Amino acid sequence: MTADIHHIGGAPVIIGAGIAGLMTALHLAPQPVVLLSRTSLGTEASSILAQGGLAASLGEDDSPDLHLADTLAAGEGLCDEQMARRVVEAAPQAVENLIRLGTPFDRSLDGRLQLGLEAAHSRRRIVHAAGDATGRELFRALLGVARRTRSITIMEGMTALRLVVAEGSIVGLLTVLHGAVFALPTRRVVLATGGIGGLFCDTTNPLSSFGHGLALAACAGAELADLEFVQFHPTALDIARRPMPLVSEAVRGEGAVLIDEHGHRLLADTPGAELASRDVVARAISDQLAAGHGVYLDARHCLGQKFARRFPAIDAICKHAGIDPAVEPIPVRPAAHYHMGGVAVDAEGRTSVSGLWACGEVACTGLHGANRLASNSLTEAVATAAWVAESVAGTSAGWQWPRLPATVPIRPDPSPIRTIVSNALGIVRNGKSLCDTVATLLPISVCETAAADPALVALLMAIAALRREESRGSHFRSDFPGRDAAALPSRLTLCTAFENAVTLRWQASERSR
C-alpha cells in the first residue's frame, strides 16, 4: 500500500477534538501537538451535547469524601477507588481552570456558582453553563483558546484509519483526508474519540460515534476494559429525531416526575424515586414501554412557566416538536448515552501499548465502575486530560518511517448493524440473543466493508456481555438477574474476543446438526 508521509516532526497526535481532546492539547502547550477532527470542529463531538454539567464538591455542605461515596455507590463495586478519589479531589480545581479559560458557568445574583442536583448525588454539586447547554458553552470556550494557541495544529476533516505499531510500540497512524491517504509518523498518540452510542438506534450521541477509538486500540493490540457497561439515559425526548435530544437529569432534580399516559406516577415507591440511579430508572421506563404504555416527564407543577428560563435549550427543542413543557408532559424513552467501558488505562492514561494514551469516554479509568454517576464524565475528561498531557510531555519524542499495512480500511458506517446491536445489547440482555449476535457480527467484522469496524466494536461488547454472567449496574442479564458476591472488572483483547467468537460459532453449528 502507498501513502504520502506527512511530516509532523514527531509531535504527539490527538485523535478527537471534543472536550477531552481540546483539554489535552491545551495542557500540552507550548509543546507542539496535532489535533485531528473527522469533521469540522464541533459538528460531531458528543461533549457538545452535554446538558448536565460537571460534578464537583463546591458547596459548603459538600466534600470530596461525599462526592466519592456517591460515585462508589453508583459504580456498584467496580470503581477503582484510588482513581475515583483522585478525580473527585481534582474536580473543584478543574472547574476553576475552566473558569480561567473562559467558561461562563451559571451564577446566582450574589455571584456564587449555581449548584444543581442530579440523580444519585447526595448534595447539590453540578455546575452548568447557559442552563442546559454546558457542553456547548464549554466547547466554545476551549475551542477559542485552542485556535489562539500557536502550538496546536488542528487538522479538520482528517480521519484516523489505523494505528501503526512496530514491536509493540506506536510508530505512526494511517489517515485519510479528502480521499487521499496519509501516514503521520509519531511515537505518541492520544485517543479522545468519545463513545459508542451511534451503534444503537436510540441514542443521544452523534450517529457517527460507533467506538472509533476502541477499534483503533483493539487492532493495535491494546487491552480493553468493562465493555459490557453501557449507560442508557432514562429520559431522551421520544421523537423521530436522531440523535435523540436529551431531557437533562437536572429537570428531575428540580422536581419533575415520571408518569404514564393516565397520569399515574411510576417511581413513587422506588427508593430514590426519579433520582434513583440511571440503570434503575431506565429499566423501569423500558418495562413500561414494553408493556405498551407511554412514559412522560411532568414538570408542570414544579417548574411550569419557569421551565423556559431554567432549561432554554430543552424548551426550544420540545416546542419545535410541538410540546410545551410548561403545560404538558414530555414524552421520553431511554437512549444509549454513555459507555463506562473503554480502552484500559492507568492513572496517567497510558494504555497497554507503548506510546498510546486514551482520555475521556473512550478510556476506562475505573472512575465509573458499572454505572456512571451523573455529570461525572465531563469532570473526568477535564481532570484526567492534565495527567495524560503530563505523561505525554514526559515521554521522549522522535519518529521512524512506519511500515504501512497492506490495505486501507474503508471509512466506517455503523448503520447496517444498529438494529442487531440494539436488540442484543440494550437495557435487558440474555445469553441466547448475545450468542446469536456474536455469530452474526463475526463475519461482518472481518470483511472489507464500511460496517467492519463498527461490527468489531459491537462484537467485543457482546463477548464482554456474555462473559459477565450476572447483573450489575447498567449490565442486566435476564438469564442471570442476580449479582455475584465478588465484583470483578473485565478485561479483553481482540485476539481473545475472536477466539471466543469462533468457539461460540462452532458450538452453535454443532448444536444445529
UniProtKB/Swiss-Prot annotation:
Lineage of the species this protein comes from: Bacteria, Pseudomonadati, Pseudomonadota, Alphaproteobacteria, Hyphomicrobiales
Residues involved in FAD binding: 17-20, 46-53, 361, 377-378
GO cellular component: cytoplasm
Pfam family, one: Succ_DH_flav_C
Cofactor note: Binds 1 FAD per subunit.
InterPro entries in the record: FAD-dep_OxRdtase_2_FAD-bd (IPR003953), FAD/NAD-bd_sf (IPR036188), Fum_R/Succ_DH_flav-like_C_sf (IPR037099), Fum_Rdtase/Succ_DH_flav-like_C (IPR015939), NadB (IPR005288), Succ_DH/fumarate_Rdtase_cat_sf (IPR027477)
Function: Catalyzes the oxidation of L-aspartate to iminoaspartate, the first step in the de novo biosynthesis of NAD(+).
Location (main, coarse): cytoplasm
Cofactors named for this entry: FAD
Coiled coil: none
Similarity section: Belongs to the FAD-dependent oxidoreductase 2 family. NadB subfamily.
UniProt record, GO biological process: 'de novo' NAD biosynthetic process from L-aspartate
UniProt-annotated catalytic positions: 278
Positions bearing the site annotation: Important in orienting the L-aspartate substrate: 118
Name under which the protein is recorded: L-aspartate oxidase
Leading EC class: oxidoreductase
Subcellular location per the Swiss-Prot or TrEMBL entry: Cytoplasm
GO molecular function, one term: nucleotide binding
Pathway(s) annotated for this protein in UniProt: Cofactor biosynthesis; NAD(+) biosynthesis; iminoaspartate from L-aspartate (oxidase route): step 1/1
Catalysis: reaction(s): L-aspartate + O2 = iminosuccinate + H2O2
Gene name, Swiss-Prot/TrEMBL: nadB
EC code(s) of this entry: 1.4.3.16
The entry's keywords: Cytoplasm, FAD, Flavoprotein, Nucleotide-binding, Oxidoreductase, Pyridine nucleotide biosynthesis
